[in-house]
Amino acid sequence: MTRTRPAPSSTAAARRRHVLLFPLPYQGHITPMFRLAGILHARGFAVTVFHTQFNAPDTSRHPEYRFVAVPDGLSGPAPVAVNDVVARILALNGACEAAFRERLKGVLEEYSGEDDVACCLIADVHMLSMVEVAKQLGVPKLTLRTGNAACFTVFLAYPMLCEKGYLPVQGMSLDPV
């Protein structure tokens, strides 16, 4: 994607702050991340969104952002079937880590000699590997948790529900469509 750049300036104060985002590729995580991107962009930040191939955002809806695709190893002509959401998130983290490291290094190198400066990575709290990569590369990092209070309560109750045998649900089948 081609970006329009402001005229170069010799002062560090004129450097454009650039925020890097990496949402978990589920709608309940993508939407809040893009809302945050909109707020940051309105306050003068340039925005780069890293995204997986799985459930990739429609880049034409956000022409003001730069998008960097990260191969996830779970999409494509022969996607890996992972029915357990937690297992899928863990698989996604593992599959994206090396490719994200490569792409993040590329973005950082691109901005090292320009008027843009990458100030931080904001990753979904479930994208643990991406946070670790940012840490290893010296990029300040923040995490965004998109769940609400009810979701937090479920997370707290999950171990107890497993201990009592309520989860995972046994003997349940879906009606054929």
Give the label of every model feature segment.
Residues M1-V177:
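Nucleotide-sugar-dependent glycosyltransferase catalytic domains
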